[in-house]
Amino acid sequence: MWQRVIFLSFFLATSPAFSQTNTYTKIDFENTCTIVEEHEIGITAICAGYTGYPVIFAEGDLRQMVRFGHITKLGDQWESFGQFNRAGDTIEWRLKDKKPYAAILRYFIENSNSDGEYKKEFEGQVLVVSTVGTHEKPTSCVVGYVDARANKNANNLSQE
């Protein structure tokens, strides 16, 4: 009997559920997002995230911002890029004890050429690392940026 208990304990301790440090979700506007505010130049929507932690998406003047988790003020502080941009749809949630503490999201930045025109070859990609709001600390903010085109190991850098 003890052999079974030891084997089961070893199996559970080494299973992915105990060692998992990240997981992924998608922002799905058609199926898991609800628009909570509309205005002339944009929207704010709440989308399904990781196991009850919502994703708050905002767009204004062709610039996007995403916040994560339980936050008390949806539009308390705008954090985006000066250039037109769009957020990707895949979120990497960084987990500790199965609870998210950070989220990583790729943004696409519409950089211009020297004449001020948008050119696809100048498009930037930035991995944005944000905190995840909890009931105890209901705020989410950007804590890091990694230039995904300038760094070969951008994803590894964003996870540090």
Feature annotation, model-predicted:
Residues 68-123:
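Mature extracytoplasmic domains of secretory-pathway proteins
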Residues 2, 16-82:
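Charge-rich, low-complexity N-terminal segments
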Residues 54-57, 91, 130:
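Generic hydrophobic, helix-prone segments enriched in Leu/Val/Ile
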Residues 141-160:
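C-terminal partner/receptor-binding element of secreted or periplasmic proteins
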Residues 107-109, 132, 150:
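A mature extracytoplasmic/lumenal domain signature
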Residues 122-147:
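Short acidic, glycine/tyrosine-flanked loop/strand segments centered on an H-E-D-like triad
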Residues 5-14:
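Sec-dependent N-terminal signal peptides
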